[in-house]
Amino acid sequence: GLIFFFGKYNQEKSLKKIYSYNYAFLGAISFSKKFKQEFANMIFLELLKEKKIIYYLDNIDFYIKEDNLAIVCIPFFNIDLNSNLLKKIIKNALELNIEKIEIITISNNQKIDNKKINIETIVFYEWALI
């Protein structure tokens, strides 16, 4: 298909997220153009290659249950500026016993110290090649 819908984990009646093979299509049906949405769409297309079931959670863009992995798209991540968001992401991940969080960025590689969960920021082009 050209358009993909996926739901929130354990909430079948929740709003679905929409992704597409064609970036222009999403721009045509949206009133606002947001780089983060286009960046998340790029990440989605990479995940689609793995043919795994994808969900989303509050503050977590992609949750792959079978890998116990949360993926968050933050193009311009900065630990100091995003500390409150990171706390929310960690809280949501720990509630589901997620073992690893990957924060996909445009320019940052960084291992974040956390005793409860493995957190890593990875530059998109490196992540896409893994």
Regions found by a protein language model. Give the residues of each.
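Short glycine-/acidic-enriched loop or helix-start segments at secondary-structure transitions
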Residues: S30, N82-S83, I112-N114
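Accessory nucleic acid-recognition modules appended to NTPase machines
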Residues: G1-N68
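Conserved catalytic cores of phosphodiester-cleaving nucleases, focusing on short active-site segments
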Residues: I43, L47, I60-K91, I101
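Domain-level recognition of nuclease-like catalytic cores that cleave nucleotide substrates
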Residues: N108-I130
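Short, polar loop motifs at secondary-structure junctions
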Residues: N59-D61, I104-K111
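Hydrophobic/aromatic beta-strand patches that form the interior of the parallel beta-sheet core
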Residues: Y19, I71, E102-I104, E120-I122
